[in-house]
C-alpha cells in the first residue's frame, strides 16, 4: 500500500543506508531495472548467448489470469528456457504451489430471532462445515512435497513445501435479531507439485458432501503448481551465473505461494527458473518501506550479464 507511515515517498526510489526504498522496488521493479542495466551493458559488446524475448506483463497480483497467461494462450510464449524474475535472490526457485480459491454458501431460512424456531440458522448450520474443513485441513497439511522450501522457511523449521487449506473469510447475517438465511465461507487451497488441482477439489468436495446442510460449493482454480527437474542443464546454468555475478552458489527451493509463471511453464513445457532481486525476510514486499539492498540490485545485473553474454 502507498498509504501509511512510509519513511520515504513510496512512488520514488530513494537510497538510504545501503537500501533502495519504494513501492514495488523488490516485487518486482528492481529486477526490471537490473535487466535494463544489463542489456545496456550487453549492447556495448553486441553479443548475447541467446536470442532474447522479454515479457513484462500485467495483473499477476490480482485474479488468476495474468498478462503472461494471456500471452501463453495466444502462443506468444516461445523459447528453449525461461527465467522468471518475480522472486527473491535467497534461492533459485524451481517449484511452486498451485492455488484454488473456494466458496461454500450454506442456506437456511430467515425468521425473527424471538421465534428463531420458525427459521433455519445458516450461521449455526455452517459450524459442521467448518469442523469438516478443519478436520480436512489437519490431514492436508500433514503432507509434504519433495521440493525443498525456501532458505527463510527452512530456518524456521519447514524443510519442504507443504499444502495448505485455509478458511479466510466468513459472511453471514444482516442484523442481531434476524435469523440468517445465508452464511458464506471462503478460503483457499494451496496445492503442492505432487498433487493435482482436480484431486484437491474432489477431496474438498468429498469432505463436505456427507453433511446435511443445504450448501453450494464453488471452486475458482488459479495458478497451477510447478516443478522443474533440478538436474536440467538450465538450472545449473542459472546457478553458475549467480555464483559468478553475485558471489554465492544458490540452493534450490520452491515457493510456498503461487506464481503465474507456473501457468506458462505448464502450458509450454519450457524449463523455468525463478530468481529475483529481493530477500524474503528483509524486503517487506506489499508492505510499508518495501526495499531492496543496493548491492543485490547491482549483483542481480551482473548475474544477468553473466547468464546472457556470449
Model-predicted segments: where are they?
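Acidic/His- and Gly-rich active-site-bordering loop/insert found
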Residues: 1-21, 44-49, 284
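Structural helix-boundary/capping segments
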Residues: 53, 60, 103, 120-136, ...
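Acidic, glycine-rich active-site loops and adjacent beta-strand->loop/helix elements
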Residues: 19, 55-63, 68, 85-89, ...
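Zn-dependent metallopeptidase/amidohydrolase metal-coordination segment
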Residues: 241, 246-308
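Short helix-loop-beta-strand segments that form the rim/entrance of peptidase-like active sites
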Residues: 39-60
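Midchain, well-structured core segments that form catalytic/ion-binding scaffolds
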Residues: 69, 73-213, 223
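Short, low-order "capping/linker" segments at domain edges
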Residues: 227-242
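Active-site alpha-helical elements of protease catalytic centers
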Residues: 24-39
